[in-house]
Amino acid sequence: MAKDNSTVRCFQGLLIFGNVIIGCCGIALTAECIFFVSDQHSLYPLLEATDNDDIYGAAWIGIFVGICLFCLSVLGIVGIMKSSRKILLAYFILMFIVYAFEVASCITAATQQDFFTPNLFLKQMLERYQNNSPPNNDDQWKNNGVTKTWDRLMLQDNCCGVNGPSDWQKYTSAFRTENNDADYPWPRQCCVMNNLKEPLNLEACKLGVPGFYHNQGCYELISGPMNRHAWGVAWFGFAILCWTFWVLLGTMFYWSRIEY
């Protein structure tokens, strides 16, 4: 392929542009996944206690893939500008490996969206919240994490339980085993607080008087951020894969026309 041909130059420009987009997407993917694994909403203890934190695994893969895509886009641009078959061959091999990792990340993140159900967090809350009799240290660690996370959620976001305060009444729980029903119909964090973070009217809260306890559940506050992150990791990654596929296809065609 003659390198001074204007058509070839135009095609090279398109491929370089395609790789620039891949590099920018790689940086964006890395930033998105770093934001996710930094756990801005402090919800990781709830996932850890389910023994299924694959969505975080998908995000860590996304960080690796994003960095690799940026580096490989630079390699691809150099190979295209120099019309080097060896550089482009290395680009293809490495890109296919990274592509496979990103496919795995997208599939993992997409399938996790159906995992965040109300029953999952309800069962976990009932079993682990204020459970002081775990079978081992690992469960104690998880119970403490779940308890602290729920205390913060209910106090900070003015909610109570997964579906509402009735969760603490309708179901058997470790909390109910540890506390008297009359004194603790639900955790103190479910009460409306004053500026000192003390119940505004404890007796009214215990009796369930409207305005003195929170009757909204916390499920949306838990599943919302998790689903958004899972959606972002999965579908932004999928969009990158689609774009990369066509850039790779065009680069392979260009590589096949380079003279030895």
From Swiss-Prot:
Record note on quaternary structure: Heterodimer with uroplakin-3A (UPK3A) or uroplakin-3B (UPK3B).
Reported function: Component of the asymmetric unit membrane (AUM); a highly specialized biomembrane elaborated by terminally differentiated urothelial cells. May play an important role in normal bladder epithelial physiology, possibly in regulating membrane permeability of superficial umbrella cells or in stabilizing the apical membrane through AUM/cytoskeletal interactions.
Superkingdom assignment: Eukaryota
Gene source species: Homo sapiens (Human)
GO CC terms in record: apical plasma membrane urothelial plaque; extracellular exosome; membrane
Molecular-function GO term, any one: structural molecule activity
Gene coding for it: UPK1B
Extracellular compartment segments: 37-60, 108-229
Name of the featured protein: Uroplakin-1b
Tissue distribution of the protein: Bladder epithelium.
